[in-house]
């Protein structure tokens, strides 16, 4: 005789007990996954911070970093300027063997009909290494601060004027490094046999497709002389008040 199976109510109680146990086990098992996600996000922020610090050490080199902010103009009271104003100023600072140059341009234009005022402030800064230094082989990072044109409504009460924030950011042109393609062109990685095969292919193209050859030579010359892509780094600067 086989053993008797448990009655239906007992089976239902057993299933309910298993479901309760599963609800207790699943949250405890899912907790480490949440902690792992938080840990990965914190590692990502740490990596971004180290990347920015490495960039500063690589291109701004210590004492240059301390003198960069002096290139940008101090806050100016634009309301005290005339309705139409233009100013350009060039400055140079010597830091060690490097020369820091800045060009400041301020424009203020007033619409006599509407009373709106457009203000533009541009600062272009560059770092020029000394001649013969190792840094001279690289393109100098170019830093630019742009202040967006901000319309200011004509003030009806001189004692109650609103402050309008301005947008500012830095554009840093990253140094160009020699590409892998240029390095291969400078080496002797192509053999004589490959050169001969390429010459045969070019000769066949000349005999069969003259028009295609002309377009091909133009495209090949353009591809060889095509400029490299310029890489720019945009850094948002805290806005100032007018």
UniProtKB/Swiss-Prot annotation:
Q: Name one GO molecular function term.
A: co-receptor binding
Give UniProt keywords alphabetically: Cytoplasmic vesicle, Glycoprotein, Secreted, Signal
Expression by tissue, per the entry, reads: More highly expressed in adult testis than in fetal testis. Exclusively expressed in the testis (at protein level). Intense expression in stages II, III and IV of spermatogenesis, whereas expression is lower in stage I.
What are the record's GO terms for cellular component? acrosomal vesicle; extracellular space
Keyword Secreted on entry: yes
- InterPro entries (alphabetical): DKK1-4, DKKL1
Locations listed in the record:
Secreted; Cytoplasmic vesicle, Secretory vesicle, Acrosome
Q: How does it assemble?
A: Interacts with SLXL1; Co-localize in seminiferous tubules. Interacts with SLY.
Tell me the protein's name.
Answer: Dickkopf-like protein 1
Q: Which organism is it from?
A: Homo sapiens
Q: What gene name does this entry carry? A: DKKL1
């Amino acid at each position: 005789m086989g053993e008797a199976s448990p009655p239906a109510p007992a089976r239902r109680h057993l299933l309910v007990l298993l479901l309760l146990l599963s609800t207790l086990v699943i949250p405890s098992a899912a907790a480490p996954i949440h902690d792992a996600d938080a840990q990965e996000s914190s590692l990502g922020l740490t990596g971004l911070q180290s990347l920015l610090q490495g960039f500063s050490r690589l291109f701004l080199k210590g004492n240059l970093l301390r003198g960069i902010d002096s290139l940008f103009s101090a806050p100016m009271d634009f309301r005290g300027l005339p309705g139409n104003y233009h100013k350009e100023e060039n400055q140079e600072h010597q830091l060690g063997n490097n020369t820091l140059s800045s060009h400041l341009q301020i424009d203020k234009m007033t619409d006599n009909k509407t009373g709106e005022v457009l203000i533009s402030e541009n600062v272009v800064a560059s770092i020029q290494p000394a001649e013969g230094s190792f840094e001279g082989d690289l393109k100098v990072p170019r830093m630019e601060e742009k202040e967006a044109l901000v319309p200011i409504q004509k003030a009806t009460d001189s004692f109650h004027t609103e402050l309008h924030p301005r947008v500012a950011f830095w554009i840093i042109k990253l140094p160009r490094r020699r590409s892998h393609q240029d390095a291969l062109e400078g080496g002797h990685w192509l053999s004589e046999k490959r050169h001969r095969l390429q010459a045969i292919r070019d000769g066949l193209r000349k005999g069969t497709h003259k028009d295609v050859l002309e377009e091909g030579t133009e495209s090949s010359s353009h591809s060889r002389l095509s400029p490299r892509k310029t890489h720019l780094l945009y850094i948002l600067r805290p806005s100032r008040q007018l």
